[in-house]
Amino acid sequence: MALDSAKKQEIISKFAEHEGDTGSPAVQIALLSERISYLTEHLKEHKKDHSSRLGLLKLVGQRKRLLNYLKRKDYEKYTQVIKELGIRG
């Protein structure tokens, strides 16, 4: 399931670097993290939903690539994002 537009706008406004920013790595990582957490909860209830599991693995891989990119390009923003999202322990 996709995020509802209100939740999506809330995430975008929280992580956007400027007005109208929807594609920066920080925003993309935050949106992916929300979808990952939703799918994780879904899979706890529906253990045999293998297509959703594959989708989850794709999202995790995409988020990992974006995090590595952000780490290379803007380390301060990277540390801020992982702290706010509570990822990479």
Swiss-Prot record:
Q: Which InterPro entries match?
A: Ribosomal_uS15 (IPR000589), Ribosomal_uS15_bac-type (IPR005290), uS15_NS1_RNA-bd_sf (IPR009068)
Extract the CDD domains matched here: Ribosomal_S15p_S13e
The UniProt keywords, alphabetically, are: Ribonucleoprotein, Ribosomal protein, RNA-binding, rRNA-binding
Q: Its Gene Ontology biological processes?
A: translation
Q: Name one Pfam family in it.
A: Ribosomal_S15
Q: Which SMART domains match?
A: Ribosomal_S15
Task: List GO terms (cellular component aspect).
Answer: cytosolic small ribosomal subunit
Mind listing the GO molecular function terms for this protein?
Answer: rRNA binding; structural constituent of ribosome
Quaternary context: Part of the 30S ribosomal subunit. Forms a bridge to the 50S subunit in the 70S ribosome, contacting the 23S rRNA.
PANTHER family reported in the protein's UniProt record: RIBOSOMAL PROTEIN S15, BACTERIAL AND ORGANELLAR, SMALL RIBOSOMAL SUBUNIT PROTEIN US15M
The UniProt similarity line reads: Belongs to the universal ribosomal protein uS15 family.
Q: What does this protein do?
A: One of the primary rRNA binding proteins, it binds directly to 16S rRNA where it helps nucleate assembly of the platform of the 30S subunit by binding and bridging several RNA helices of the 16S rRNA. Forms an intersubunit bridge (bridge B4) with the 23S rRNA of the 50S subunit in the ribosome.
Designated name of the protein: Small ribosomal subunit protein uS15
Q: Supply the source organism for this entry.
A: Nitratiruptor sp. (strain SB155-2)
What is the phylogenetic placement of the source species in the record? Bacteria, Pseudomonadati, Campylobacterota, Epsilonproteobacteria, Nautiliales
Gene designation per UniProt = rpsO
